[in-house]
Amino acid sequence: MNIQIFGTKKCNDTKKAERFFKERGIKYQFIDMKEKGMSKGEFNSVAQVNGGLSGMINWDGKDKDLLALIKYTADEDKLEKVLENPTVIKTPVVRNGKASTLGY
């Protein structure tokens, strides 16, 4: 099992997901979205399972200006904006092979 948790160190839901796996003795790999982010392929595979691009975006996030920019950007440019600003993605993203979940 190769479990990956994409999130930020400050996110409470990401901390809950990490604690879930630690308590059960399950090994996982943590990827900090602020430092590394997700590749286009990783993002697309997770988005496919979780409701597409708009399902991956945390519309209740703090940066309302950036969210408005993404909302009104042309569809072909939205993906690039989201990948440039990974803090707008719902966290945690937990991946295990092709299966993935969003949020805790």
What are these model-derived regions, one by one?
Residues M1-M33:
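Local sequence-structure signature of Cys/Sec-based thiol-disulfide redox active-site neighborhoods
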Residues M33-Y104:
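Thiol/selenol-based redox catalytic cores and closely related redox-interacting motifs
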